Curated annotation (Swiss-Prot):
Native organism taxonomy: Eukaryota, Metazoa, Chordata, Craniata, Vertebrata
Gene3D superfamilies, A to Z: Toxin ADP-ribosyltransferase, Chain A, domain 1
Signal sequence segment: 1-22
Domain TR mART core: 73-273
Organism per entry: Oryctolagus cuniculus (Rabbit)
Protein's UniProt name: GPI-linked NAD(P)(+)--arginine ADP-ribosyltransferase 1
Tissue expression per record: Primarily in skeletal and cardiac muscle.
């Protein structure tokens, strides 16, 4: 019964691809100097979900954070800027920044340091770029993470913040988002390939806002683990959604013209992590037994029901509706 629907989806995808390829693009500095990189499962990414060790990580944060401040000036400066902004916003009360929307109260367990971490990540500072570059390489080995990754605190706080903010969604709430990337032209894998984004990926509910982040690669994404962080972003007008590095996607369609941006369309599949609670294992589990949940290290896929719902959504509105600013 799904054959006609799948056929329609394929035809629609092919039509979108032909429309994209038919367009001409001017050669710009972006096209000449952007780097190329494959889009794959990002095997070197550090993807810890901290399943079963969140409380232990929280207890370790004061010492760990101080240590990282001493060796990582970019992180220390970014955290100081975000802390100042958090204090100002807290003093303003429920209306933050330029937004006139009254924010809902934060979820249970959400602490000031979660808010500061989100502000630090979204600020217009060198921190975002250096942090994600480090995340993409920190998982090359456990030793590399333990000895050379000086963003352990920020990685944990961002991961836990997204888990807490997404907890009220009950079942995964999937949404269409857009992501523009500057300086990287991804080499898309073929349709049907499973991929990850390799780091914490900022996207927007608005395609025009996403283009401001860059147009070397432009993604259209159906995400089920990405969480809206508008109220906790330095720039709430961007309607930002933050996607964790362990979410997996299926490539639905892709184009990589000789000139102009690569365009890649992804649909959520589930999540996969190679690491879990690595810092706690190193600090606490050598001298005494630790009982940690290792379930996060296995591949988890969306349920069949949610996969079908995603397919229906694609068929209902098209993978990525053509609107001004997208094509």
């Amino acid at each position: 019964m799904w054959v006609p629907a799948v056929a329609n989806l394929l035809l629609l995808s092919l039509g979108l691809l032909e429309a994209i390829q038919a367009q001409s693009h001017l050669v710009t500095r972006r096209d000449l100097f952007s780097q190329e990189t494959p889009l794959d499962m990002a095997p070197a990414s550090f993807d810890d979900q901290y399943v079963g060790c969140a409380a232990a990580m929280t207890a370790a944060l004061p010492h760990l954070n101080l240590t990282e401040f001493q060796v990582n000036k970019v992180y220390a400066d970014g955290w100081a800027l975000a802390s100042s902004q958090w204090r100002e916003r807290s003093a303003w009360g429920p209306e933050w920044g330029l937004s006139t929307t009254r924010l809902p109260p934060p979820p249970a367990g959400f602490r000031d340091e979660h808010g500061v971490a989100l502000l630090a990540y979204t600020a217009n500072s060198p921190l975002h770029k250096e942090f994600n570059a480090a995340v993409r390489q920190a998982g090359r080995s456990r030793a590399h993470y333990l000895q050379h990754f000086s963003f352990k605190t920020l990685h944990f706080l961002l991961t836990e913040a997204l888990q807490l903010l997404g907890r009220d969604q009950r079942m995964p709430r999937c949404r269409q988002v857009f992501r523009g990337v500057h300086g990287l032209r991804f080499r898309p894998a073929g349709p049907g390939t499973t991929v990850r984004l390799g780091g914490f990926a900022s996207a927007s509910l608005k395609n025009v806002a996403a283009q401001q982040f860059g147009e070397d690669t432009f993604f259209g994404i159906w995400t089920c683990l990405g969480v809206p962080i508008q109220g906790y972003s330095f720039f709430p007008g961007e309607e930002e959604v933050l996607i964790p590095p362990f979410e997996t996607f299926q490539v639905i369609n892709a184009s990589r013209p000789a000139q102009g941006p690569a365009r890649i369309y992804l649909k959520a599949l589930g999540k996969r992590s190679s690491y879990n609670c690595e810092y706690i294992k190193e600090m606490q589990c050598k001298s005494r037994p630790c009982h940690l949940d290792n379930s996060a290290s296995a591949q988890e896929r969306l349920s069949t029901a949610w996969s079908l719902l995603l397919l229906l959504a694609f068929l209902a509105v098209g993978p990525f509706p053509g609107s001004p600013g997208l094509f």
